[in-house]
Amino acid sequence: MDAYLEEEFYDILTYCIENPNASDLESKKQRVSIIGKELHADGGADAMENMFYSIEFRIKDELGRDAQQYRSWWNNISDEWKY
């Protein structure tokens, strides 16, 4: 399950980075939040951190961009996650 979520998460963040003015960003943000909730339910804040770190690294390596600003999309899922 995590592999599917990771690929979907990567695709969504890549889309958001490459299309910052797209009209569907709010729906993308909502899906990212759902992915974060699923990860948290499965493995807590550690699972969230591991997934985001992996995605950040891939985006930096493949696109040369920084995805850190999107960490805030998972705020309010866990008391441990505050960005």
Regions found by a protein language model. Name each.
Residues 1-13, 25-31:
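Short amphipathic alpha-helical heptad-repeat segments
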Residues 34-50:
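Amphipathic alpha-helical coiled-coil segments
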Residues 10-17, 36-37:
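Amphipathic alpha-helical repeat scaffolds
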Residues 50-83:
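Amphipathic alpha-helical binding modules
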Residues 32, 39-40, 60, 70:
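Compositionally biased, low-complexity repeat tracts
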Residues 3-8, 21, 46, 58, ...:
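Exposed, low-complexity/repetitive linear segments and helix-based recognition motifs
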Residues 14-26, 43-45:
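Charged, low-complexity interaction regions
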